[in-house]
UniProtKB/Swiss-Prot annotation:
Catalyzes the transfer of a methyl group from 5-methyltetrahydrofolate to homocysteine resulting in methionine formation. This is 5-methyltetrahydropteroyltriglutamate--homocysteine methyltransferase. Its cofactor is Zn(2+). L-methionine binds at I428, G429, S430, E478, D593.
Length: 748
């Protein structure tokens, strides 16, 4: 039996983050365009070669200088009129779309399905026009590196329009126009003698109407005339449309067999067409735990009843974009944990090992096979994976969702203690992380006293600046934190932190998701010392800053041997202990950030309620012991909350800040009259280097007051300030305070 191997996509970042370094050096002017393109070409060469060592077929077109959705939009001429004509190869124009320029707002950014990757939302043009076949250019480059192994990847036209927030008849109308353009792209790629053309259509695993399906089917009936199309799905199953997909005249179908458990059953129940290839996503592209190879061997062998081996390609469940590059870059992980991990390069090795075992028998690869199984078992047998005291404490919670005193009764108690003005100003939490700060953190273990002095000096600096600017509710700036999840993970038992486990969040922004390897609990205070020190420097209230249980879960690689709801409850209890200690230290406002709350939603609405129930419960486990006079804040990112407003209200936070600056108030229009707690929608976009003017901020505040009474509105940036410079922060926050004073005067 001859099984081929591939993956849906591969990480862009590289070991040591050469991707990030090249981008940021180019943006800062330290690298010219020639040098930048040379650095990117070297990175692309290396990632192609790495894949070709293990795989039979290498995806090409998944790489991007910022975001693959943006690349597709530019290729199709979907450039907002405010930017004028942008040539597909013009780097300045390309990055202006992503980051804004000269007062022009960037494209809106939001979460890519239910992941922590961000994409730029396409704006529909008046007229579609194919600018350049950018994937064809990547294929020609790749064929010089890996030869016939190169196969192209396109973001499918139907999912592209769904990502642009089109639906129903409007989607069908635009899809007709795009189909002709995609047909040309497919023809040109097919002429390169590629094995097949992967068209990513992950939106099929969400809710799809009959009208939308008909538009999809018509598109692919046409595209299949022009090349060998494999419709690639991921992040779930396609069971509602499985039989219809099998009837399409496409070359093959890519299915997620990890998250999409029901896809296995669909194949077994309905069979699989003998004229198509199956790209079977059998290794996890989203989580880092080693595959259970023995189980996969049995399952894949069973697939041979339905799919001949020559038509079966072993692959990842989704793009490996969500994984770090390699476990071999880690030097300090406990062996009991590292033995159970598989990052992107290890996933390639798993696929190669599986294919060899299936082709020649396990005996042919016995030593490697046995070592892989033993490594996984070493983690399962590890100390700390199960902690009886933690299991007992979570069991004692029962099944009820804990509650505080009613919001209406808490408000006067909080105002009496805090005495805040109308339209109180604050920031979301983080302040710029300077080079000196990063250097001090890197040297912390060698010089802990010097590090503590640096942190306290930075906190004092941040407090003094905020007082100087006239901010009402202060933050300590989080100088001790490398990342809002990573910091807490490094101080909670059950978590382990990687050194080189970087994954792309958006553009050059990379994060290191920690790994939840065992039961989670707090062994000591997490943030009390820094917050209490900040409060000692000012009479204004300082917010305690914590990361909520759902975000701690969503932005981590979570153990796969315990339900996510159970892990979230464990984190909630650890945070409850921290809230109690912050109150005891005199902190009267505590913010528990949940920027990832919405991204945890399953992609089909029928599955939402179960998630929302346990997510709300985990948050309230963390907050329910807080005093009524303690004001609980939360913060959420890039989200459309209108359809989950009941769950947001059920969190029972006193104040919520949301990332709405790029959405022109559309979110608030849906919340009008449906949410009674206080809201800070974000008055400017921190992801853009553009500095808002006082006039722009006044206009934004007036817009917000069309939807919210002044008593309900808070004034703040739309996210943390960690990625900005102090010069940018000073200019923006001073303008924000000035604008707030003007609006207050107008109201009074």
């Amino acid at each position: 039996m001859n099984f081929q191997t591939t993956v849906v996509g591969y990480p862009r970042v590289g070991v040591g983050r050469p991707y990030k370094q090249a981008l940021e050096r180019f943006w800062s002017g330290k690298l010219d365009e020639t040098g930048f393109r040379a650095a990117i070409n070297e990175l692309c060469h290396d990632r192609l070669a790495t894949q070709a060592q293990r795989l039979d077929l290498v995806p090409v077109g998944d790489f991007s200088l910022y975001d693959h959705v943006l690349d597709t939009a530019l290729m199709l001429g979907a450039v907002p009129a405010r930017f004028g004509k942008v040539d597909a190869h013009n780097l300045q124009g390309y990055f202006a779309l992503a980051r804004g320029r000269d007062g022009l707002p960037a494209l809106e950014m939001t979460k890519w399905f239910d992941t922590n990757y961000h994409y730029l939302v396409p704006e529909i043009p008046e007229r579609w026009e194919l600018q350049a076949n950018l994937v064809l250019e990547q294929v020609r480059f790749a064929q010089n590196v890996v030869g016939a192994k190169a196969r192209p990847v396109l973001l499918g036209p139907w999912t592209f329009l769904r990502l642009a927030r089109l639906a129903g008849a409007e989607l069908a109308q635009h899809l007709q126009q795009l189909t002709a353009m995609y047909a040309q792209i497919v023809r040109e790629l097919n002429d390169c003698n590629v094995a097949f053309i992967q068209c990513d259509e992950p939106a099929l695993v969400g809710d799809v109407t009959e009208e939308e399906w008909q538009a999809f089917a018509a598109c692919y009936r046409e595209l299949s005339k022009h090349g060998k199309i494999v419709v690639q799905t991921y992040y779930g199953d396609v069971t509602p449309w499985y039989r219809e997909l099998c009837r399409l005249p496409i070359h093959g179908l890519g299915l997620d067999l990890v998250q999409g458990h029901a896809n296995w059953a669909a194949i077994q129940y309905h069979g699989f067409p003998q004229d198509k290839i199956l790209v079977a996503g059998v290794v996890n592209g989203r989580n880092v735990w080693r595959s259970d190879l023995a189980d996969l061997y049995t399952k894949i062998t069973g697939l041979s009843e339905f799919v001949a081996p020559e038509r079966l390609i072993l692959s990842s469940s989704c793009s490996l974009l969500h994984l770090p590059e390699t476990v071999t870059a880690e030097r300090n992980l406990p062996v009991a944990v590292s033995s159970g991990l598989a990052f992107a390069q290890e996933r390639l090795a798993e696929l190669e090992l599986l294919a060899n075992a299936l082709r020649d028998g396990i005996a042919s690869v016995q030593p490697t096979w046995d070592a892989a199984l033993a490594s996984r078992q070493q983690w399962l047998d590890g100390v700390g994976r199960i902690v009886p005291a933690v299991r007992e404490r979570t069991a004692a919670l029962g099944t009820e969702t804990p509650a505080r005193l009613a919001y209406a009764e808490r408000v006067p108690l909080q105002q009496a203690k805090l005495n805040l003005p109308l339209l109180p100003t604050t920031t979301i939490g983080s302040f710029p992380q300077t080079a000196a700060l990063r250097k001090a953190r890197a040297e912390a273990k060698r010089n802990p006293t010097g590090y503590a002095e640096t942190i306290n000096a930075e906190i004092a600096h941040v407090i003094a600046l905020q007082e100087q600017w006239g901010i009402d509710v202060l933050v300590h700036g989080e100088p001790e934190r490398n990342d809002m999840v990573q910091f807490f993970a490094e101080h909670l038992a059950g978590y382990v932190a990687t050194q080189e486990g970087w994954v792309q969040s958006y553009g050059s922004r990379c994060v290191r998701p920690p790994v939840i390897a065992g039961d989670v609990y707090r062994t000591a205070a997490l943030s009390v010392a820094e917050t209490a020190y900040a409060q000692s420097l000012t009479k204004r209230p300082v917010k305690g800053m914590l990361t909520g249980p759902v975000t701690m879960l969503q932005w981590s690689f979570v153990r796969d041997d315990l339900p996510r709801s159970a892990v979230a409850a464990q984190i909630g209890l650890a945070l409850r202990d921290e809230v109690t200690d912050l109150e005891a230290a005199g902190i009267n406002i505590i913010q528990i950030d949940e920027p990832a709350f919405r991204e945890g939603l399953p992609l089909r609405r029928n599955d939402w309620q179960n998630y929302l129930d346990w997510a709300v419960r985990a948050f309230r486990i963390a907050t329910s012991d807080a005093k009524p006079s303690t004001q609980i804040h939360t913060h959420m990112c890039y989200s459309d909350f209108n359809d989950i407003i009941a769950a947001i209200a059920a969190l029972d936070a006193d104040v919520i800040s949301i990332e709405d600056a790029r959405s022109a108030g559309s979110l608030l229009a849906g919340l009008e009259g449906r949410y009674t707690q206080q809201i800070g929608p974000g008055v400017y976009d921190i992801h853009s280097p553009n500095i808002p003017t006082v006039e722009q901020l006044v206009a934004r505040m007036r817009q917000l007051l069309n939807y919210l009474p002044a008593e309900q509105l808070w004034i703040n940036p739309d996210c943390g300030l960690k990625t900005r410079t102090y010069a940018e922060v000073a200019a923006a926050l001073q303008a924000m305070v000035t604008a707030t004073k003007q609006v207050r005067n107008q109201i009074s």
